């Protein structure tokens, strides 16, 4: 846990001092939201500052700075939800938004008095808050230029380098009709590099990057040169890549970035809204085996400085580590307030939204498989012929049945227990529950991906983290190679 000013208090002071949104104003808006007889109301105030600079082939291509602000107002009446938002924090605009959301409970016309109690956050999982947004543009450009020089110096075949840096500072305040007021100040940054290697007519590109819930201190851990050299290494590696073997073969998933396969192919099916609707492969299966007994999966929003971490969710609930699968047994789902009420469960701190313009839904934060008893060498050494997957560009999954397709960005052939030739971009085709049941070895080298993933669901994007130890899936379909 990082020692820093209480972000909840900081957020409350920010909205009170800048916009006059104090406890009295909040209580009045909540009363307006419940004026038509709603059971519960919630205000979600947001002020977000974004910045981005990109360098393309040694030229500054863009430099952007934007501010977005507003409030989303939700009213719950039975199983119905009314939602409205306004980009204006003017008192009259907010009152009209509250009245619009209130119409879901129209007909009761019950006056409601709200007693609000601000609360502080007991823990913060972010960095020291030395925000990139506080750095001059010239300092950010210097970081990009360092990456450009390092990638080009790595090998003469590097013909082009693109780099970008993005930062965000989001101040949120959640006020609820049960009296709770809680806020947060959420930093986020990301640094990306693309390198292009050219040998004759053979052109190969690779992209890498990282970031998290921190600021300039990220570069004390991973320098621009580190990121650039990794992108260059991957691009050069693809120059000598060969076709992947086709058909069903053993697949070793490397520690770290391979966790995106776990996130997409399995994690979404464990979000409670899909199970409430009966559209998930895991509906009504709590307490049942859903994976190999080597598999334990958690979703943990409390990992310090990770991209998916948050102090409180967007409903104001404290976040925590949630065990989803334990020893192959399904233990629970990820809940927001609505799904928790439906299942008679406690909220898991998983209610998230892209912004004040969007409704709440259960979402993952940092989704991880815990380490097992084997070593990475033992896992790889057990494979006579298969593939070793290090990183992915993303994929597609059918939530209802778990079928997925993923494309690798770095993968290798395994022959007689040894990693040999690099492979061209390769598609993995499979089924999430089936892949979990085929996990035959799990190593002790768990690693978290370095903060580059964003998850999309029903039109909403949120930052997430993924992690995995080295894992052997005894059989998975390799569905072809895309020539670079």
Where are these regions (language model features)?
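N-terminal small-residue-enriched
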Residues: 1-484
């Amino acid at each position: 846990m990082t020692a820093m000013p209480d972000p909840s208090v900081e957020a409350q002071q920010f909205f009170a001092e800048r916009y006059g949104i104090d406890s009295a104003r909040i209580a009045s808006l909540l009363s307006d939201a419940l004026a038509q007889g709603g059971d519960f109301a919630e205000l979600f105030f947001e002020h977000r500052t974004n910045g981005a600079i990109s360098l393309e082939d040694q030229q500054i291509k863009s430099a952007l700075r934007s501010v977005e602000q507003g409030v989303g107002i939700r009213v719950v009446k039975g199983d119905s939800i009314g939602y409205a938002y306004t980009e204006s924090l003017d008192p009259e605009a907010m009152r009209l938004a509250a009245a619009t959301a209130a119409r879901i409970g129209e007909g009761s016309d019950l006056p409601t008095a709200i007693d609000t109690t601000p609360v502080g956050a007991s823990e913060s999982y972010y960095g020291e808050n030395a925000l990139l947004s506080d750095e001059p543009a010239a300092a950010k450009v210097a970081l990009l230029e360092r990456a450009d020089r390092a990638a080009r110096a790595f090998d003469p075949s590097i013909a082009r380098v693109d780099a970008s840096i993005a930062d965000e500072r989001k101040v949120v305040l959640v006020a609820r009709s049960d009296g709770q007021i809680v806020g947060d100040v959420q930093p986020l940054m990301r640094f990306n590099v693309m390198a292009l290697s050219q040998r004759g007519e053979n052109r190969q590109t690779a992209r890498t990057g990282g970031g998290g819930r921190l600021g300039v201190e990220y570069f004390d851990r991973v320098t621009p040169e580190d990121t650039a050299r990794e992108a260059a290494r991957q691009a050069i590696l693809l120059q000598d890549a060969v076709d992947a073997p086709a058909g069903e073969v053993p697949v070793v998933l490397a520690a770290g970035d391979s966790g995106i396969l776990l996130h997409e192919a399995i994690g979404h099916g464990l979000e409670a809204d899909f199970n409430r609707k009966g559209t998930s492969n895991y509906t009504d299966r709590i307490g049942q085996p859903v994976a190999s007994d080597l598999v334990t999966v958690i979703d943990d929003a409390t990992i310090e400085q990770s991209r998916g971490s948050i102090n409180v969710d967007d409903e104001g609930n404290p976040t925590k580590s949630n065990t989803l699968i334990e020893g192959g047994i399904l233990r629970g789902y990820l809940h927001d307030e609505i799904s928790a009420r439906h299942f008679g469960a406690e909220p898991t701190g998983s209610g998230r939204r892209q912004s004040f313009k969007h409704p709440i839904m259960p979402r993952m934060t940092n989704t991880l498989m815990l380490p097992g008893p084997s070593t990475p060498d033992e896992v790889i050494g057990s494979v006579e012929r298969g593939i070793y997957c290090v990183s992915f560009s993303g994929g597609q999954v059918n939530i209802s049945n778990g079928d997925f397709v993923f494309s690798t960005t770095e993968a290798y052939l395994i022959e007689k227990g040894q990693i040999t030739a690099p492979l061209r971009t390769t598609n993995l085709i499979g089924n999430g529950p089936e892949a979990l049941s085929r996990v035959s070895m799990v190593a002790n080298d768990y690693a978290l991906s370095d903060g580059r993933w964003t998850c999309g669901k029903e039109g909403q994007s949120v930052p997430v983290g993924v992690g995995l130890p080295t894992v052997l899936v005894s059989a998975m379909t390799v569905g072809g190679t895309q020539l670079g």
